[in-house]
Structures are given as structure tokens and as C-alpha cells.
């Protein structure tokens, strides 16, 4: 069967599943073995439980809204040092090269998880999507430029 899209009146063909107009590959180049081992051994959870136990009252006072959190919260290098210590306690061997590769991705993930614990799951994605989700960023780019460039965006991919 053939269908026409509502907005651009493009013809799309049914019968076999959904094929995206634009393919965007996820960037996994910053996911290191060290990071993967930390996640697998529960280090993120250990860190987050300790961090939230220690700082929840301060965080609640300082960031009463997600907007205040997004504007002012930064997970410091000292905070990340606590993560490395938690990894050592879980027998996850430190790897400097892997840490350098994954450090900022880890910082973003932990920031998103802290936002989730303070507010809701929605805020996890409000942190992660604009920073780390390539398909999300590409979709926003296409939608924001749609009126000016329309179908050319899709045809040019």
C-alpha cells in the first residue's frame, strides 16, 4: 500500500516495518571498558546512593526547580573522584586512558541520574538528550528547519 504524509504529501510505502527517512548512528566512541565495568559492577548506583545521602538536603535547597538545577549544577572533578574510589572498592581496576575517554560522558550520565532522583525521569532525558542523543539532536535540527528547507532535508540524506 501507498500513503501520503500529511505535511509534505510525500509518498511512503507500507508493508514491512518502519524505515527512517534519516539514519543517525549512535556515537559509542566514548564508551570505554572501564566505564562498562563500572556500570556492570553497580558502581554508578553505589556512587549515586552515597552522593544523594550526603547532599540531598543541600541539593533540594539550592535547586528547587529543574531549571535552577540545569543552570547551576555541576558534578565536580572531586565528586568524580568519589566515583573512582567506589569503583576501586568494587574491584574495578582504574584505567587512565579509558577514564580520559569516558569522563565527560560519565559526568553527563551521573548528572542526568541526579536530576532524575531530584525531580523525575523526564529530567533525566532533559539532561541526556541535548548532550548525548544524536538521533534526538538530528530530529530537532530537521524539525526546526522544516519550514525553510522542508523535504529537501530528507531528500538530501
Q: Model-predicted segments: where are they?
A:
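Conserved functional hotspot residues or short segments at active or partner-binding sites
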Residues: 1-157
Amino acid at each position: 500500500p501507498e500513503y501520503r504524509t500529511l505535511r509534505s504529501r510525500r509518498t511512503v510505502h507500507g508493508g514491512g516495518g518502519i524505515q527512517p527517512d534519516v539514519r543517525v548512528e549512535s556515537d559509542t566512541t566514548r564508551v570505554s571498558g572501564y566505564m562498562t565495568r563500572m556500570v556492570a559492577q553497580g558502581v554508578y548506583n553505589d556512587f549515586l546512593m552515597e552522593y544523594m545521602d550526603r547532599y540531598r538536603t543541600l541539593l533540594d535547597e539550592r535547586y528547587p526547580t529543574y531549571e535552577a538545577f540545569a543552570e547551576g549544577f555541576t558534578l565536580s572533578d572531586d565528586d568524580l573522584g568519589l566515583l573512582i574510589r567506589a569503583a576501586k572498592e568494587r574491584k574495578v581496576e582504574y584505567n587512565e586512558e579509558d577514564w580520559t575517554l569516558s569522563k565527560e560522558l560519565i559526568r553527563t550520565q551521573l548528572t542526568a541520574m541526579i536530576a532524575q532522583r531530584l525531580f523525575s525521569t523526564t529530567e533525566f532525558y532533559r539532561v541526556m538528550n541535548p548532550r548525548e542523543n544524536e538521533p534526538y539532536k538530528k530530529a530537532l535540527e530537521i524539525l526546526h528547519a522544516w519550514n525553510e528547507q522542508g523535504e529537501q532535508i530528507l531528500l538530501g540524506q
